[in-house]
């Protein structure tokens, strides 16, 4: 498949046909979730944020909207939708959730569940000034091109940990965000 011409219908068909196996073992027990917002267009986009430089953790990094599951959340999906509304003003009612990817462990001790959702193209995004410094859209076909990601092995506390690095325009996409995008690409059958 030529991913430069990936349509929303192609993406949805491939995601639904190749359902994720979510029984993956994780080390962390604290729950968090992120929303992977796919912008509904003939050539879909991937909505990303750049975190505020004033945050204590992951300052200035490119990320999906998301955060810890709290006591008011009924599920990880509810947490992802709540965080997306808090961070970039995406109303939960405007998100068509199509599924989740397997949870991943974060270096900060969370088990993070990526929630994949389709959002309308005309939403007036409004970044929460406390948490987000920028909101931008990357063409989904470009985001899912595995050749754009480069591995880097980091050693932490005696263990090797592989992270992925990439650039989009002037944004440095790496770490968990790049790993989740790669997982989404692999999930729909993109070959390395």
Curated annotation (Swiss-Prot):
It comes from the Bacteria. This is Uncharacterized Nudix hydrolase NudL. Transmembrane segments: none annotated. Keywords: Hydrolase, Magnesium, Manganese, Metal-binding. Its EC number is 3.6.1.-. Residues 29-160 form the Nudix hydrolase domain. HAMAP family: Nudix_NudL (MF_01592). InterPro entries: CoAse (IPR045121), NUDIX_hydrolase-like_dom_sf (IPR015797), NUDIX_hydrolase_dom (IPR000086), NUDIX_hydrolase_NudL_CS (IPR000059), Nudix_NudL (IPR023735). A motif (Nudix box) lies at residues 67-89. One of its GO terms (molecular function) is coenzyme A diphosphatase activity. Mg(2+) binds at residues 83, 87. The keyword Transmembrane helix does not apply. Its cofactor is Mn(2+); Mg(2+). Belongs to the Nudix hydrolase family. PCD1 subfamily. One of its GO terms (biological process) is nucleoside diphosphate metabolic process. The gene is nudL.
């Amino acid at each position: 498949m030529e991913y430069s011409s990936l349509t929303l219908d192609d993406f949805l068909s491939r995601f639904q046909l190749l359902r994720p196996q979510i029984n993956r073992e994780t080390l962390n027990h604290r729950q968090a979730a992120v929303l992977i917002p796919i912008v509904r267009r003939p050539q879909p986009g991937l909505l990303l944020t750049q975190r505020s430089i004033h945050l204590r953790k992951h300052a200035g990094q490119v990320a999906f909207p998301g955060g810890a599951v709290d006591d008011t959340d009924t599920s990880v999906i509810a947490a992802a939708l709540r965080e997306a509304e808090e961070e970039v003003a995406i109303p939960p009612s405007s998100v068509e959730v199509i599924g989740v990817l397997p949870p991943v462990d974060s270096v900060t001790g969370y088990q993070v569940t990526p929630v994949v959702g389709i959002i309308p193209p005309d939403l007036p995004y409004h970044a929460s000034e406390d948490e987000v410094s920028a909101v931008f859209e990357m063409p989904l076909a470009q985001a899912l091109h595995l050749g754009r990601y480069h591995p880097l092995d980091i050693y932490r506390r005696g263990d090797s940990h592989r992270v992925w690095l990439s650039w989009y325009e002037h944004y440095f996409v790496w770490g968990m965000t790049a790993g989740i995008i790669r997982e989404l690409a692999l999930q729909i059958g993109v070959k390395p």
